[in-house]
């Protein structure tokens, strides 16, 4: 026990924290195979200018069977070959697949309604250790961070200010509670035995 790293669930982690050298290594292999992907999440936030920690690499991928196969093949460059344990079609089926290898890589079908095709419309390619890597734009990241997760709040604050400074002010979305209110109304009717 002691100071070993832990994942978000508090379980001991066997993966080390990734860095931009990992982004370059994985990106080079994804590019070599012609896989369609865009970096989202923590590394994209860091690339946008917000210095923060991240424990994984988040990739939004095009969810065709062929592209998913290419992405998994590219990730087999990691030493434990954990991507080989992922069944074909898993990302399409489960929306997010976590691959725990030397570093943790999350493969995503979409986030907050943003899929690969949408993210690529304004993605920005940056050289990372000489490798061209597509990153989600700050506006796309803003859209993808509209969650109830407490850990997304600092990212939203940063992105809102960055977008405003860049001339693209955004407003915090007003949550659509109509569905929740309707369910509550029906539940109260059943509870009280009325119409």
Which residue ranges define each predicted feature?
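Compositionally biased terminal segments of proteins
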Residues: 1-195
């Amino acid at each position: 026990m002691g100071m070993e790293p832990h994942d978000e669930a508090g379980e001991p982690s066997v993966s080390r924290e990734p860095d931009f050298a990992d982004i370059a290594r994985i990106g080079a292999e994804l590019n070599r195979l012609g896989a369609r992907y865009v970096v989202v999440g923590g590394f994209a936030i860091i690339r946008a200018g917000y210095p923060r920690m991240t424990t994984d690499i988040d990739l939004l991928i095009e969810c065709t069977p062929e592209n998913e196969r290419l992405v998994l093949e590219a990730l087999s460059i990691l030493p434990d070959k954990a991507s080989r344990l992922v069944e074909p079609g898993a990302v399409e089926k489960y929306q997010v697949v976590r691959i725990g290898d030397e570093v943790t890589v999350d493969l995503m079908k979409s986030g907050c309604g943003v899929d690969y095709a949408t993210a690529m419309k304004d993605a920005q390619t940056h050289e990372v250790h000489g490798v061209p890597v597509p990153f989600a734009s700050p506006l796309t990241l803003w859209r993808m961070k509209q969650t109830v997760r407490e850990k997304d709040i600092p990212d939203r604050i940063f992105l809102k200010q960055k977008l405003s400074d860049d001339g693209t002010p955004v407003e915090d979305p007003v949550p659509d509670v109509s569905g929740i209110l309707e369910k509550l109304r029906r539940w109260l009717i059943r509870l009280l035995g009325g119409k």
